[in-house]
Amino acid sequence: MAIKTYKPYTPSRRYITGLSSEDITAKPSVRSLLVKLPAHAGRNSYGRITSRHKEAGAKKLYRIIDFKRRKFGIEGKVEAIEYDPYRNCRIALIAYKDGEKRYILQPRGLSVGDIVAAAESGLDIKPGNAMKLKNIPVGTIVHNVELKPGKGGQMIRSAGAYAQLMGKEEKYVILRLASGEMRQVLAECMASIGEVGNEEWANVTIGKAGRNRHRGIRPQTRGSAMNPVDHPHGGGEGKKNSGRHPVTPWGKPTKGAKTRRKKASDKLIISRRKGK
């Protein structure tokens, strides 16, 4: 997939880059798989901001994606590759032999006309197929990995993401994530074969503020530009610094300090991600 550049008809277009849409099939989406989601814009049920710098963005319809991949024993044919406004990878429309249609994440190398399937075991190791982790050979690249059997894929779903199956231990398998983290996952969990497509997404330059506004991202104001009542870095004359180590608006250390709480799943992490 190629990166597009634009002629600088306006100053803001000079540095914009985008992705070519040559891989997208020119046909409408399946209406039964579209649903309108309410725009929360970072607010909770009381209307209070719980996630800053968010807004509704451009109007869009959510595509219902099959993250579980538990339609066993029935082959499906890729009918279309489509754009999904809710994610940075493409999605593939699968038409199964029993007449049902579902969307899945498009792995790298999957194209219109290919045949995919899901089963507990016994499938070819090719992009788009899905099996239980215990039956996937060691060394295989996987994506859309479940954390709890039957719950649906929760890890490794964004454009260009992947994990490698490194080994098997009793009821667990060991995955190496792209970050370098080594993690145990239950062997009964499902995973899809291959790397998530649209890997060039990481090289796209947003280029102008309006493009982020369309995506639902509001501007971020520096704490040093605020008043002392609004941020620990606020106040002072001119561009005077705050005189303290960088912190969040609530006083937690930022810029490298670890603030993640311990979770029960920490015991499944064999080695932490490597710093980049």
From Swiss-Prot:
Q: Which domain of life is it from?
A: Bacteria
Location of the region described as Disordered in the Swiss-Prot/TrEMBL record: 210-276
Q: Please tell me one Gene Ontology term that the record gives under cellular component.
A: large ribosomal subunit
Is this entry keyworded rRNA-binding? yes
Protein family according to the UniProt entry: Belongs to the universal ribosomal protein uL2 family.
List the keywords (alphabetical).
Ribonucleoprotein, Ribosomal protein, RNA-binding, rRNA-binding
Q: Which GO terms describe its biological process?
A: cytoplasmic translation
Q: What does this protein do?
A: One of the primary rRNA binding proteins. Required for association of the 30S and 50S subunits to form the 70S ribosome, for tRNA binding and peptide bond formation. It has been suggested to have peptidyltransferase activity; this is somewhat controversial. Makes several contacts with the 16S rRNA in the 70S ribosome.
- GO molecular function terms attached to this record: rRNA binding; structural constituent of ribosome; transferase activity
Q: Which Pfam family is an annotated match for this chain, by its short name?
A: Ribosomal_L2
Give residue spans, biased composition: Basic and acidic residues.
Answer: 230-240
Where is composition skewed (Basic residues) in this entry? 255-276
Among InterPro entries, the record links this protein to:
NA-bd_OB-fold (IPR012340), Rib_uL2_dom2 (IPR014722), Ribosomal_uL2 (IPR002171), Ribosomal_uL2_bac/org-type (IPR005880), Ribosomal_uL2_C (IPR022669), Ribosomal_uL2_CS (IPR022671), Ribosomal_uL2_dom3 (IPR014726), Ribosomal_uL2_RNA-bd_dom (IPR022666)
Protein name (Swiss-Prot/TrEMBL):
Large ribosomal subunit protein uL2
Key word Ribosomal protein present = yes
Quote the subunit structure annotation.
Part of the 50S ribosomal subunit. Forms a bridge to the 30S subunit in the 70S ribosome.
